[in-house]
Amino acid sequence: KRRTQQLRSTPEVLNSSQHSLQRAQFSRYAVNIVERLQNAGYQAYLVGGCVRDMLLNITPKDFDVATSATPEQVRAEFRNARIIGRRFKLVHIHFGREIIEVATFRANHPQNDEEEDSNQSSRNESGRILRDNVYGTLEEDAQRRDFTVNALYYDPVSERILDYANGVHDIRNRLLRLIGDPQQRYQEDPVRMLRAVRFAAKLNFGIEKHTAEPIRELAPMLREIPSARLFEEVLKLFLSGNASDTFEMLVDLELF
C-alpha cells in the first residue's frame, strides 16, 4: 500500500516567534496587495516558492499571492491589474517593472466525469488534467498543490504561517514530498516528475522515498505532454544552476 501525505483539515499556525520570516523581507508591493485584499474582506496570503525560499534564506525570484477573491474582484480593487490565462485565470498586478501574480484559491478535481463541470475541469483517460478553472477554499487550494514545501501560506499582516502539510518540517529536514497519493498526482500532471527533480536539485533536497517510488514506472507518461510545455520545463531544469546534479537525477530516475 502506498503511503500518502494527507493534509490537516485545519492548519498548524506558526506565530512569528516560531519561524524566521519577517514582513519586511518580502516585496512591499506583494505585502500591500495582501493588506488591501484583506481590508476589502477577502482572505489573502503570500504563498508558494517565495515563502519556501525565504525560509531557506534564498532570495525569491518572484512573489505570489493566493486569495479568496475572484480575478474580477481582484481587478476591481487594483487599477494596475490585468487578467491573464485561459486554462486558469490569474491576475497580474503591475508596479513598474515588478509584477505580482495573484491567483484565486483553486479546488480539487472530482475523480469521475459525473461529478465535474466539463466547462471548468476535465481529465483524459489516463487521469491527466486538461482544463483547470475550478475555484475553491483555502483548504482545497492547499490540497491541490504539488509538494508540501510549496503549500505554505504566509500572512504578512499577522506574520503567521499556515501549514497544512508539515511543509515547515520538510523544509527543516530538506525533504521534497508530494501531497496526496504520488502515483495519482503524477498521473494528473506528469510534469510533476520533472518538477520533483528540479526542486530537489535546486534546493539540494532529497526526494522522499514514496514520492520517488512511482517515477520510473510512470516516466513514459511524459510523452503525452505537449512538446512546447515539455521544452519549457526542460529549460527550467537545466537553467536553474544545477545542471550536473539535475542530469544525474534524471538518469537515475529513468526520466532521461
Feature-to-residue mapping (PLM):
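Catalytic cores of the polymerase beta-like nucleotidyltransferase superfamily
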Residues: 1-256
